[in-house]
Curated annotation (Swiss-Prot):
<comment type="subunit">
    <text>Homodimer. Component of the RNA degradosome, a multiprotein complex involved in RNA processing and mRNA degradation.</text>
</comment>
<feature type="binding site">
    <location>
        <position position="165"/>
    </location>
    <ligand>
        <name>(2R)-2-phosphoglycerate</name>
    </ligand>
</feature>
<keyword id="KW-0460">Magnesium</keyword>
<protein>
    <recommendedName>
        <fullName>Enolase</fullName>
        <ecNumber>4.2.1.11</ecNumber>
    </recommendedName>
</protein>
<feature type="active site" description="Proton donor">
    <location>
        <position position="207"/>
    </location>
</feature>
<comment type="function">
    <text>Catalyzes the reversible conversion of 2-phosphoglycerate (2-PG) into phosphoenolpyruvate (PEP). It is essential for the degradation of carbohydrates via glycolysis.</text>
</comment>
<feature type="binding site">
    <location>
        <position position="337"/>
    </location>
    <ligand>
        <name>(2R)-2-phosphoglycerate</name>
    </ligand>
</feature>
<feature type="binding site">
    <location>
        <position position="388"/>
    </location>
    <ligand>
        <name>(2R)-2-phosphoglycerate</name>
    </ligand>
</feature>
<dbReference type="InterPro" id="IPR020810">
    <property type="entry name" value="Enolase_C"/>
</dbReference>
<dbReference type="Pfam" id="PF03952">
    <property type="entry name" value="Enolase_N"/>
</dbReference>
<feature type="binding site">
    <location>
        <position position="367"/>
    </location>
    <ligand>
        <name>(2R)-2-phosphoglycerate</name>
    </ligand>
</feature>
<dbReference type="InterPro" id="IPR036849">
    <property type="entry name" value="Enolase-like_C_sf"/>
</dbReference>
<dbReference type="GO" id="GO:0004634">
    <property type="term" value="F:phosphopyruvate hydratase activity"/>
</dbReference>
<dbReference type="GO" id="GO:0006096">
    <property type="term" value="P:glycolytic process"/>
</dbReference>
<feature type="binding site">
    <location>
        <position position="285"/>
    </location>
    <ligand>
        <name>Mg(2+)</name>
    </ligand>
</feature>
<dbReference type="Pfam" id="PF00113">
    <property type="entry name" value="Enolase_C"/>
</dbReference>
<keyword id="KW-0479">Metal-binding</keyword>
């Protein structure tokens, strides 16, 4: 007998920034159930699906999500009772139609996503499968993703003087995911020692990376290279560098406010190009603003065969916007964030579109996270080959890494570590 949805319940919980978010539980007639919690971003793309907040300044500074909870426990629950949880596309379609807007502004993308993911977990649990096998099929193909580890935070993720948001290490040369995690942890500790020895702040930002004040953004690269060598690894062989410029946050009146200079798109591209020549940079995310499509085209023409160019704010995990970008030859990879689009079905469609056009895929967390580990399973299920889930501290980040360790043990030889094969920019 087919199990059907018998109950859906949402409630407020706290995310890693002490802001409310939703946790949703979907229960089936078989008594199997699934739970999921929804993340939240700090630097958000203008075209992201709408995260519904209460705006009641008497509660949580206006950031409560009681209305989104009510939407789950009321109209969404009523619409989905009796549905087969295996019918993910149909369930997501029902919620999208019930909302009735292009950006999920009525019910809230946070409400819809929580239900969408909890339904998938319920179906997986009912089939006695881990989520990655339920979504990816029993035979895969599976691979363990290369982690992009954010070890120096700046921009909107910290209160320091760095313009760029994330300076990351990418342990491409490791033989397994477990070893990649070890490489990253050892560099993290080496970097902390460097910071302490120089009297620099070793407190961490939203995503667990250190947030020191430095003379300039380039000094972050220099510090990280020193830490890599201190940990006895070789930059550009064992470990590469990656950057999230989050340039939409710097873009005003057609210029980029960078290190107290007002740079044109061409000047920003020149700066990024110079760094790719000077440092072992393998990936640049949001090198230009989401509203600077002409600049993005120039950036792609300049660097598409030399480095991974990741579109986050410009694509917002939206398959329609990604398709437009592919046609215009914008970027060569996409950052995938579940809550930017708001359903599992649309997320999987975006991943499929990217992969069919040889765009790199990086499954990503948000700066406001919970202990939910969905993105770890999603990265393996979709054979995305890259994951971005923060630094090597803070339980909200480490939970994803530990889940990936568990998956690697379960799959063993079925899921080789992607390594350099994860990067498609020189094979398009």
């Amino acid at each position: 007998m087919t199990a059907t949805i018998t109950d859906i319940n949402a409630h407020e919980i706290l995310d890693s920034r002490a802001n409310p978010t939703l946790e949703v539980r979907v229960t089936l007639s078989s008594q199997a159930y699934g739970c999921a919690a929804v993340p939240s971003g700090a630097s958000t793309g203008e075209r992201e699906a709408v995260e519904l907040r209460d705006n009641d300044l008497e509660r949580y500074g206006g950031k409560g999500v009681l209305q989104a909870v009510e939407n789950v426990n009321g109209p969404i629950r009523d619409a989905l009772l009796g549905q087969d949880p295996r019918s993910q596309e149909e369930i997501d379609r029902i919620m999208i139609e019930l909302d009735g807007t292009e950006n999920k502004a009525n019910l809230g993308a946070n409400a819809i996503l929580g239900v969408s993911l909890a339904v998938a977990y319920a179906a997986a649990n009912n089939a006695d499968l881990p989520l990655y096998r339920y979504l990816g099929g029993d035979g895969g193909p599976f691979s363990m993703p290369v982690p992009m580890m954010n070890i120096i935070n700046g921009g909107a993720h910290a209160t320091n003087n760095l313009d760029f948001q994330e300076f990351m290490i990418v342990p491409v040369g490791a033989p397994t995911f477990a070893e990649a995690l070890r490489y990253g942890a050892e560099v993290f500790h080496a970097l902390k020692k460097r910071l302490v020895s120089r009297g620099l702040m070793s407190a961490v930002g939203d995503e667990g990376g250190f947030a020191p004040d430095l003379p300039n953004n380039e000094a972050a690269f220099e510090l990280i290279l020193e830490a890599i060598e201190d940990a006895n690894y070789v930059p550009g062989k064992d470990i590469y560098l990656a950057l999230d410029a989050a340039s939409s946050e710097l873009y005003q009146n057609g210029r980029y406010d960078f290190e107290n200079n007002q740079l044109t798109s061409e000047e920003m591209i020149d700066r990024l190009t110079e760094w790719t020549k000077k440092y072992p940079v393998i990936s640049i995310e949001d090198g230009l603003s989401e509203n600077d499509w002409a600049g993005w085209k120039l950036l792609t023409e300049r660097l598409e065969n030399k480095v991974q160019l990741v579109g986050d704010d410009i694509f917002v995990t939206n398959p329609d916007i990604l398709e437009k970008g592919i046609k215009k030859n914008i970027a060569n990879a996409i950052l995938v964030k579940l809550n930017q689009i708001g359903t599992l079905t649309e997320t999987l469609a975006t991943v499929g579109l990217a992969k069919s056009n040889k765009y790199g895929v990086i499954i990503s967390h948000r700066s406001g996270e919970t202990e939910d580990t969905t993105i770890a399973d999603l990265a393996v299920a979709t054979d995305a080959r890259q994951i971005k889930t923060g630094s090597l501290c803070r339980s909200d980040r480490v939970a994803k890494y530990n889940r990936l360790l568990q998956i690697e043990r379960e799959l063993n030889d079925q899921a080789p570590y992607a390594g350099k094969e994860a990067f498609l920019f020189n094979r398009k």
